[in-house]
Amino acid sequence: MTTKLERRLKIKAGVRGKISGTTERPRLTVFRSNKQIYAQVIDDTTGKTLAAASSLKLDVKAPKKEIAAKVGELIAKGAQEAGVQTVVFDRNGYLYHGRIKELADAARNGGLKF
């Protein structure tokens, strides 16, 4: 029987085999811990992070979904400042639900296309 972490890592490996960020369309990846949420826009051809945002930068007491939405807005703004309009969304093995969905929707509303 596999644990939740083993299941997520197995899904992550399968997704990362299919998804790769390019210079024209970098990868927007998300990491979720119990308390924080992080997002990065990565160009996999050079291995460089073009933009990053996390809930650590926010000094807001709010529900986790609202904080995830604010991180989505921040990553969209940072990506546009780096000259990125379209991305490939990498949910990193997490279900597209809850905080991950809120972050993705906020990034879309912020102007990113994926």
Curated annotation (Swiss-Prot):
Origin superkingdom: Bacteria
GO BP annotations listed: translation
Name of one Pfam family that matches: Ribosomal_L18p
GO molecular function terms attached to this record: 5S rRNA binding; structural constituent of ribosome
Gene Ontology CC, one term: cytosolic large ribosomal subunit
InterPro entries in UniProt: Ribosomal_uL18_bac-type, Ribosomal_uL18_bac/euk
Keywords: Ribonucleoprotein, Ribosomal protein, RNA-binding, rRNA-binding
Function: This is one of the proteins that bind and probably mediate the attachment of the 5S RNA into the large ribosomal subunit, where it forms part of the central protuberance.
Self-association state and partner proteins as the record states: Part of the 50S ribosomal subunit; part of the 5S rRNA/L5/L18/L25 subcomplex. Contacts the 5S and 23S rRNAs.
HAMAP family per record: Ribosomal_uL18_B
Family membership: Belongs to the universal ribosomal protein uL18 family.
Protein name: Large ribosomal subunit protein uL18
Native organism: Parabacteroides distasonis (strain ATCC 8503 / DSM 20701 / CIP 104284 / JCM 5825 / NCTC 11152)
Encoding gene (name): rplR
